[in-house]
A protein has these predicted regions:
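Glycine-rich phosphate-binding loop signature in dinucleotide/nucleotide-binding domains
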Residues: 1, 99-102, 153-159, 218-222
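N-terminal helical cap/lid subdomain that shapes the substrate entry/recognition surface
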Residues: 3-91
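Conserved Lys-Pro-Asp/Glu-containing loop-to-beta segment of HAD-superfamily phosphomonoesterases
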Residues: 5, 142-171
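Substrate-recognition element of Asp-dependent hydrolases with the DxDx(T/V) motif
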Residues: 25, 90-119, 132
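Conserved H-loop
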Residues: 35, 125-129, 156, 205
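A short, structured active-site edge motif that brings together acidic residues
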Residues: 125-140
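Acidic, Mg2+-coordinating phosphoryl-transfer loop and its flanking beta/alpha structural elements
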Residues: 163-203
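Short acidic-hydrophobic, aromatic-tinged amphipathic segments that line or gate anion-handling sites
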Residues: 202-210
């Protein structure tokens, strides 16, 4: 099988964004007078749309959820967005993909304007042919964001594209888009190899060294 492109998730795949996201959630909970959450509950906010996470823990109307989501997003952008760390070795992986003429895309559930700001800050934009995030009102599914990337990359056969991510949203989005999937267990969603194996995949990576080996086995890099 020949592959032409690799599309990456952001939170838990390219960047460890836990510090900034958890700080922003705690800030929002405090400002809005909501019941505090445990550390393990707070970590579930990393990755999914903020509205989904709020609805999981608070019995509020959709309108109130959206109002709180906007407070969170404003706080995150203004105070906490850049509190993130690139995963060790990820730039080397991206360098190798570009050297092997593999197109790179980025598809994230982060709101698109925030996503572009953080990706440019950490210089991921120099690798990516295309970068897309979510809309303001949580209308887009991960598949929709992925398909935007595929369309702009200009490839017609999605089976020759690999999605890389740390969650079931990434795996399902890839399958719905007709793409292959590599799951990573160093992020926030998948905690183990067994978690990833619930979904069709062409590789499971516990770190970027593993990821290198998978790409070599798939003849994507040399």
């Amino acid at each position: 099988m020949t592959y032409d492109a690799v599309i990456f998730d952001v939170d838990g795949t390219l960047l460890d964004t836990s510090e900034g996201l958890i700080s922003a959630v705690n800030y929002t909970i405090d400002v809005c007078g909501l019941t505090p959450l445990t550390e393990s509950q707070l970590r579930t906010f990393i990755g999914p749309p903020i509205q989904n996470s709020l609805a999981k823990y608070y019995d509020l109307s959709p309108e109130k959820i959206q109002e709180i989501a906007e407070i969170f997003r404003d706080a995150y952008k203004e105070k906490f967005l850049l509190q993130a760390v690139p995963y060790e070795g990820i730039y080397t992986v991206l360098d190798k993909l570009v050297q092997n003429h593999i197109k790179v895309g980025i598809a994230t559930y982060k709101r698109e304007d925030y996503a572009l700001q953080i990706l440019e800050h950490f210089h991921f934009d120099k690798y990516a042919t295309v970068m897309h995030g979510a809309d303001n009102f949580n209308q887009m599914k991960k598949k929709d964001i992925i398909q935007l990337c595929v369309k702009e990359i200009g490839l017609t056969d999605p089976s020759r594209i690999i999605m890389v991510g740390d969650s079931d949203n990434d795996a399902i989005g890839a399958a719905d888009a007709g793409m292959k999937f590599i799951g990573v267990t160093y992020g926030f969603g998948f905690a183990s190899k067994e978690d990833v194996m619930q979904f069709e995949n062409v590789g499971i990576s516990k770190n970027t060294k593993d990821f290198f080996n998978i790409l070599r086995q798939l003849d994507i890099i040399f």
